[in-house]
Amino acid sequence: MTEFTTLLQQGNAWFFIPSVILLGALHGLEPGHSKTMMAAFIIAIKGTIKQAVMLGLAATISHTAVVWLIAFGGMVISKRFTAQSAEPWLQLISAVIIISTAFWMFWRTWRGERNWLENMHGHDYEHHHHDHEHHHDHGHHHHHEHGEYQDAHARAHANDIKRRFDGREVTNWQILLFGLTGGLIPCPAAITVLLICIQLKALTLGATLVVSFSIGLALTLVTVGVGAAISVQQVAKRWSGFNTLAKRAPYFSSLLIGLVGVYMGVHGFMGIMR
């Protein structure tokens, strides 16, 4: 952080605001940040571009607010809470959360797939011993989706969103609330930058850089939401292998998230031991 501190003292960091926005956008492509939930939400409510923008801005507000709360809370709790000492601990804590999330995702996906296979075998056994030679004519159809597996994580989000919003018009307050809860996980890098700015009495610059970083993150979230609403169904129709890839995606995601968590944990531990 020596180079960045020097830039701040020279007053040249203002020129890096566009770069910070770009870094925030790239940071949004990393695992996490509730991109899956937000994309699923936009698809479920058949959201418009305006609603996707609103969702991303709400996530930006909560993301920025949490960064400020953690930074100022740490400054109040301990006068010796410096950026150099805070960053490794934040990385280590984040690593524990990320690795735990990766294990949970992998276990839940595996368990959901196993339960689905057991239900399928039981369903096939019943049909083998009972010939259904009667028809149900009740004026409505019983639709059972036994033929396609959906991972437990995606199914839980889909069922929850469908139960809450299916058949009803979604209000702006509901969209804002969903976006606010999606941005509650702070970024250690953004907190560190803000702490450095506070220590150098560059509070306005620190606020601007954090907001710029969050704007970049919001752009990614908005793009994901809008892109999901427009393209997912089209891709599924045109490419038969999309569903197969989607079934395996949680395993790859959990592995990638776990590797990121291990890297952050090692990096944070090395920083603490220095």
UniProtKB/Swiss-Prot annotation:
Subcellular location per the Swiss-Prot or TrEMBL entry: Cell inner membrane
UniProt region (Disordered), positions on chain: 127-153
Keywords: Cell inner membrane, Cell membrane, Cobalt, Cobalt transport, Ion transport, Membrane, Nickel, Nickel transport, Transmembrane, Transmembrane helix, Transport
One GO CC term on file: plasma membrane
Upregulation: By nickel and cobalt. Transcriptionally repressed by RcnR.
Transmembrane segments: 13-33, 57-77, 87-107, 175-195, 210-230, 252-272
Chain ranges on the Cytoplasmic side, renumbered to this chain: 34-56, 108-174, 231-251
Membrane topology label: Multi-pass membrane protein
Biased composition, class Basic residues, residue ranges: 129-144
Membrane topology, Periplasmic segments: 1-12, 78-86, 196-209, 273-274
Keyword Transmembrane: yes
InterPro entries, alphabetized: Ni/Co_transpt_high_affinity (IPR011541), NiCoT_RcnA (IPR051224)
Gene Ontology molecular function: monoatomic cation efflux transmembrane transporter activity; nickel cation transmembrane transporter activity
One GO process term, biological-process aspect: response to cobalt ion
UniProt xrefs under PANTHER family: NICKEL/COBALT EFFLUX SYSTEM RCNA, NICKEL_COBALT EFFLUX SYSTEM RCNA
Functional description taken from the UniProt entry: Efflux system for nickel and cobalt.
The family this protein is said to belong to: Belongs to the NiCoT transporter (TC 2.A.52) family. RcnA subfamily.
Entry protein name: Nickel/cobalt efflux system RcnA
Originating organism: Escherichia coli O9:H4 (strain HS)
